[in-house]
Amino acid sequence: MPAPQKDGPRANRDIRGVRDVQLIDQDGQNRGVVPFFDALAMAEEVGLDLVEIAPNSVPPVCKFLDYGRFRFNEQKKQNEARKRQKTVEVKEIKLRPGIDKHDYDVKMKAVQRFFEEGDKVKVTLRFRGREIAHQDIGLRLLERVKQETQEVAKVESEPMLEGRQMIMILAPR
């Protein structure tokens, strides 16, 4: 049995290689197994299209529908589903080991806002020059970030050193 076309279900004469179909009329009533050409003639009498709903069943299930309206409604459903879908972004907050209190507070407000929007946050702590020798200061700073966000976020990846920066990823709860 040929697979359905890529742009939706087959309709009318596009349905090929079938002798009988399980027919459902426009009111949703099951008419039983009917020869394909009889079903096509009945659809034309009613002024609707014969649309293949379940091509993989034996015999294939076909229904009387207005094919144009059917395609329109399917497209509408897909668009609605796409609108409801939220893509999770990873936002980055860059810190330094010697960050001042006010600067830290501003960064934490941004982190809170990102979590409210449902985004993940990548906290990057960059070491410059000899600061790399004092990784414990950076680790304490990232632990502080972790403590302050523990109610709204969970740690996805623990702080780890990559080159001259320490990275931690937080995800909203």
Swiss-Prot record:
GO terms for biological process: ribosome disassembly. GO terms for molecular function: ribosome binding; translation initiation factor activity. The keyword Transmembrane helix does not apply. The keyword Protein biosynthesis applies. It comes from the Bacteria. GO terms for cellular component: cytosol; membrane. InterPro entries: T_IF-3_C_sf, T_IF-3_N_sf, Translation_initiation_fac_3, Translation_initiation_fac_3_C, Translation_initiation_fac_3_N. Its main location: cytoplasm. Keywords: Cytoplasm, Initiation factor, Protein biosynthesis. Gene3D superfamilies: Translation initiation factor 3 (IF-3), C-terminal domain, Translation initiation factor 3 (IF-3), N-terminal domain. Pfam families: IF3_C, IF3_N. It is found in: Cytoplasm. PANTHER family: TRANSLATION INITIATION FACTOR IF-3 (PTHR10938), TRANSLATION INITIATION FACTOR IF-3, MITOCHONDRIAL (PTHR10938:SF0). Belongs to the IF-3 family. Monomer. IF-3 binds to the 30S ribosomal subunit and shifts the equilibrium between 70S ribosomes and their 50S and 30S subunits in favor of the free subunits, thus enhancing the availability of 30S subunits on which protein synthesis initiation begins. This is Translation initiation factor IF-3. It comes from Methylorubrum populi (strain ATCC BAA-705 / NCIMB 13946 / BJ001).
